[in-house]
Amino acid sequence: MNFAQRMSLATDNPVDALVRFEDVKKSYDGINFVVKDLNLDVFRGEFLTMLGPSGSGKTTTLMMLGGFEQPTLGHILLDGKPVERLPPEKRNIGFVFQNYALFPHMTVAENVAFPLRYRGITGAAAKEKVRQALGRVSLDALGDRRPAQLSGGQQQRVALARTLVFEPSLVLMDEPLGALDKQLRERMQIEIKQLQTSLGITMVYVTHDQSEALTMSDRIAVFHDGRIQQLADPKTLYDEPSNRFVASFIGENNTMPCTLLGREGGVAIARMADGTTLKAAGANVSGTGANISVSVRPENISLAGKGVRAGLNRFSGKARDVFFLGDHMRLSVEAFGGQLVTARIPARQARHFALGEDVVLECGISECRLLEA
Amino acid sequence: MTVAEIDRVNIFMAVRRAERPARRAALSLALPLIVFLVVAFVAPILYLLVTAVGNPETREVLPRTLEALQNWDGASTPDEPVYAALAADLKVAKDNSTAALLGKRLNYEISGMRSRVLATARMVEKLDTGPYKEKFLALNQDWGSPETWAIIKRNGGSLTPYYMLTALDLKQAPNGSVERVQGDQAIFLDVLGRTLFVAGLVTLFTLILGYPVAYVLTIAPKAIAGIMMLMVLLPLWTSLLVRTTAWVVLLQSDGIINDVLMALHLTGERVQLIFTRVGTVIAMTHIQLPFTILPIYSVMRSIPTTQLRAARSLGAPPSSAFWRIYAPQTLPGVVAGCLMTFILSLGYYITPALVGGPRDQMVSNFISTYINRDLNWGLAAGLGVVLLVVTLAIYLLFLRLVGADKIKLG
Ligand SMILES: Nc1ncnc2c1ncn2[C@@H]1O[C@H](COP(=O)(O)OP(=O)(O)O)[C@@H](O)[C@H]1O
Ligand SMILES: [Mg+2]
């Protein structure tokens, strides 16, 4: 059974959720909630990422799941059982911390063997498990080193090995790649993802890096201000952001304020600041809110072709900034009476634009989304 | 040298040359401190070392006598020329008023020598001619004793082991062999042992009391930690004398501590705290607490909170996580703090003097007594050297045991 099948099963049969947050709220100071009304199921074998800006409550959520913080209100169920009373060491959850938290006074092998002694595994059996775990992260030769003698990437692998060695049912990772340089980070993303799939581990992963989330996850929960803004698979999240925050946090988006004039079929007619209209998809926006906008990604805007075609919005503006970036060109255009709209023009269409030159752009109606704040 | 080696040397020289101005600038910045340290720290210690083995008195006051003793066999009573030389030396000494100095120095090794030298000097003044030997012997039989002369001769050298030996409860017999001093004269090893014991006890108590405080300081919310830190530091901002005096007041038999103990019915009668070792240890522990706490705190603060969490998540119950993960990482601070308190405690002086009883005096108190009351700088320096050596030895021992990199003072 692959993951997708299991997930479709899971939705029918909610008991398959390994972790369930039920109306969880958390406040540290008794005044402000840093986690508000969290309801979330994590399915078995799933790679779920909590993505959000710093301070949005991701770590707090993870700490509650790990047993290091108590929910102020609500419940967390692990395997269907509430875990409020269960101390961290009894949860059998692997936790990879942001700074790895390797034990500096122990060798790499001792670090990895640490969780085994609490599970009654000692001597030759422990040695063998440590060897396997280090082999899995390609660190066979470094067992006698101290953590301080390792590079950041190697430390990260040790932390991974130490967590995987006791075969936890659930692994939590809090921005585990944050301290690594870009290249290494990308390699580790793939390695972690491969380990997770091949070992069938359930993973809850925290990051503020959207591309990391898109690369690795089965599902992404976008956090903002203590709430899940949207919970979906990467493609849905990217193509169909459910609000303006998600739209601008994942990838790049032009956000253009508007008012809703009416609907034609499934298409909304939006009036822009200068009175021109745009058509946009966005079935679930009521339009009564004051804070509505049309959102469209730069790569979905192109230079207008000859002749008018159906299914396209067309608008004009004056060129402001032009950057040539090799494979594409970024063109910022002032449109709708002062609104800056950025388009990503493929290199083969790139040409020179003078400052203030009139430019006509177009974008697909289905790629313009009507969003609320 | 090969060409490559010559090149390497040239490059090395070039680097040195290029960095010379920076080196000079750095040196000139450090120079005032270096001068200060040499004048105020290195020089006094060197002077202390010299004083502990220096032996100028006999050489300066009795040059002719020592000369005459050159040919003495060391076993019989010396002959007339020695006494004549002594008479001549003592006349000069009387004129220069250095006889008392000599008497005091010889008195350390031959009791009664001080008054004998002074009396003899007075007598010699009135004698114009010899023979002197009978007159000396008539004045005091002991002038004929070979042991007296052996000790005088022995002190003709510019160095003496006398003070160092005395500081270690040892003495040199007239025949030159080193032996242990007897009974109630053997006090200094006791004092040294007591000093080490009290310092060790104070160190232990500051650790037991300070370690949890340091831990709470690291985990408490900022505002509370700030207030706690202030309370830890406050004693450091008060003069040692003031704090000690405060303890004198508190520890009185009718003082607050006894009042409280009585009120709580913890004791039936008032406990003698002042002028006891208990009192000394209490007061010293209080004064030393910050010195133990601060290095531990600074090390604890550098341990990420995730260390304990990681241990817990891997399956360690709280106590196990503490002892196997947290405590070992605080060791550098513990060693630094304890070393600091222990070494500082070895030198305590005012507190034992004011709070302790006569049997609780530490090495420093004896040093002070020998300097201030007995004017015996040699013995004071000898004790100082012993204290210095013990301190260094303990320091080196710690370095050996835990490694220099494990000691973090900040
Ligand atoms: N131990 C704590 N005590 C008080 N406030 C905290 C604590 N940990 C986090 N917070 C606050 O909770 C909010 C969410 O923090 P966190 O969960 O760490 O967010 P994230 O991991 O998404 O950056 C932040 O405003 C942070 O200041
Ligand atoms: Mg965080």
State each model region's role.
Chain A
Residues 74-82:
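Conserved ABC transporter NBD signature motif
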Residues 66:
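Helix-to-loop junction immediately C-terminal to a conserved catalytic motif
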Residues 20, 41, 77, 360-362:
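ABC ATPase nucleotide-binding domain
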Residues 2-6, 239, 272-322, 347, ...:
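Glycine/charge-rich catalytic "coupling/switch" loops of P-loop NTPases
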Residues 47, 88-245:
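ABC ATPase nucleotide-binding domains
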Residues 51-53:
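The feature captures the beta-strand-to-loop junction immediately N-terminal to the Walker
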Residues 59-62, 158:
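ABC ATPase nucleotide-binding domain helices that frame the ATP-binding cleft
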